[in-house]
């Protein structure tokens, strides 16, 4: 908001004036999905999508938004994941007037790491959650046209305490 650390005030000055200084840079290195078809066009990392949307909302020129690549308007959107970043993506896609928004998550609602409030808000906004599902491969010629999805069953809890996802044999379906 028109403030740059080091230019408008030094980090030392901020520390002197405040009880705490929180630096929230977030995670900017996407996790790669290593499945067949992950090299197809129109598959984007979450932060690229969210950053483009935020910049556009601030009035910036964003080439990949302006050319339609990162604009969800009138598109069928699938978001993979169950954390707060995934919830930000599904809700942003809804606000951009996507035709449909689905969220694939490999566990059930009770074992999801994201905020339950965010999930409830996304559901109220029309996001369809496809619980107990995991992408198997992306299908298409040059760009993604469908996603082949495996159904999941939950096993025993893992180190995190959440039940471990196990792929159900011969259960795949397409979205």
PLM regions: where:
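Glycine-rich dinucleotide-binding loop and its adjacent helix/turn
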Residues: 2, 30-96
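A Rossmann-like FAD-binding core segment of flavoenzymes
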Residues: 1-32, 54-67, 95-175
């Amino acid at each position: 908001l028109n403030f740059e650390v080091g230019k408008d005030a030094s980090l030392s000055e901020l520390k002197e004036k405040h009880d705490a200084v929180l630096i929230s840079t977030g995670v900017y290195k996407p996790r790669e999905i290593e499945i067949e078809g992950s090299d197809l066009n129109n598959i984007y990392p979450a932060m690229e999508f969210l950053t483009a949307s935020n910049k556009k909302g601030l009035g910036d020129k964003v080439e990949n938004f302006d050319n339609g690549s990162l604009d969800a308007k009138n598109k069928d959107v699938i978001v993979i994941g169950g954390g707060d970043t995934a919830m930000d993506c599904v809700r942003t896609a809804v606000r951009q007037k996507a035709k449909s928004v689905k969220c694939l998550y490999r566990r059930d609602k009770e074992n999801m790491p994201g905020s339950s409030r965010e999930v409830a808000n996304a559901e109220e906004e029309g996001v369809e959650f496809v619980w107990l599902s995991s992408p198997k491969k992306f299908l298409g010629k040059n760009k993604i046209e469908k996603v082949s999805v495996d159904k999941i069953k939950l096993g025993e809890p893992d180190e995190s305490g959440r039940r471990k996802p196990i792929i159900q044999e011969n259960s795949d379906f397409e979205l």
